[in-house]
Amino acid sequence: MVSSTAGYRSSALGKLKAFISLTKPRQLALLMLTMYGAYFAGGGSLDPRMLALLTIMGFTSIGGVTAFNMYFDRDIDAIMGRTRRRPLPSGVLNPYEALAGSLALVIAGVLSAAAINTYVALTVIAGLYFDIIAYTQLTKRFTPLSIIFGSIAGSMPALGGWAAAAGSITTGGVLMALIVFLWQPMHVWFLGYYFKEEYSVARIPILPSNGNPRLVSSLIAVSLAGLIAVAWAFALYYGYGFLTAVITTVLAALAISRIGGFARTGERREALKLFKFASPIIAVVFIILPLERTLVYTLLLG
């Protein structure tokens, strides 16, 4: 009886860990950082109830959407070498367990968002639509343009964080969401280039597998230039964020210079390095901007 109970607990714990991995914890943490950063950059308070709701909303909605995508993409994951050991293709979780858990998280995400305000709930619903339906169901397997819908979905946590602070969707939230949107080609395409053979085997049309290093590099450089422009537009519009804009400019310019080298060689190792360089860029923006706002308002209010 004791060994049977211990085995059950071990199995249950293993399934819980497996389900948590479906939420892609690292990606989840980065997107929640954009949510918190936008919330505090928009003047959000340290009210415990609000922070609790925001945390629950972020974890359940972002994690739930990601887990849903894992459920729908389990056939692709079984083909690609880097994903076939994930919980669903490896059999650690069955599809019904993944679907039930994903649905529970998404429902909790929508309800907690609605408890904050209507605009936050709308960003969660928009994220669900653009990620699960527009991206995963309608475009991912058919066109490289699917990145547009995936990037819109990825920018919703930032828009929702700002809406939680401002009480509505305003210019600042749109600009912060646009920063995330313009950052994502670097994040997605360099990883896609590194694994382009696997994407080809799985018949997933992404630009790196169909194009060439120069085309990929040019489009990513344009998106980073746009990111710089949006960072400066935010600073000029709100009167704070100039330090963030300067640092963003330096990091993006450094990335563009390295992208130039990749365009000439097309080396996979360099693509992986550039993919890893993408996360610090977005992290810096969403950490420094709220700190800068706090400093500016503290000085102004004396």
Swiss-Prot record:
The keyword Transmembrane helix applies. InterPro entries: Protohaem_IX_farnesylTrfase, UbiA_prenyltransferase, UbiA_prenylTrfase_CS, UbiA_sf. It catalyses: heme b + (2E,6E)-farnesyl diphosphate + H2O = Fe(II)-heme o + diphosphate. It is a multi-pass membrane protein. GO terms for molecular function: protoheme IX farnesyltransferase activity. It is found in: Cell membrane. GO terms for cellular component: plasma membrane. The keyword Transmembrane applies. Coiled coil: none annotated. HAMAP family: CyoE_CtaB (MF_00154). Carbon 2 of the heme B porphyrin ring is defined according to the Fischer nomenclature. NCBIfam families: cyoE_ctaB. This is Protoheme IX farnesyltransferase. It comes from Aeropyrum pernix (strain ATCC 700893 / DSM 11879 / JCM 9820 / NBRC 100138 / K1).
